[in-house]
Amino acid sequence: ACLMVRKSVYDEVNGLDESFAVAFNDVDFCVRVREAGYTNVFTPFAQLYHYESKSRGLDENPVKRKRFISEVERFQKRWAKQLAAGDPCMNPNFDLMKEDFSFDIKPLE
């Protein structure tokens, strides 16, 4: 993740939560920034390369997988209300549990 924020805002929300050792520390931070009344802004004009998991490796071994699942559960519990309300920037037709923008196909009633 690449984040830019004023130091005063970073300090106000107590920075990144180290209990999210690998996953969700950036997302948790952005939700806390928004909850504090600030706006998160995305720019398509910045360009950078991020090689996901390049330095730490993938979450394939049992210990890393367990840590990841724990962080998912903790994030979902902490932000249950906000997650239930939905992401205002996310297309409601996409499956929120997948990273590939798959459609969330619901059976017809």
Question: Where are each of the predicted segments found?
Answer:
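A short, conserved alpha-helix in the catalytic core of glycosyltransferases
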Residues: 1-14, 19-49
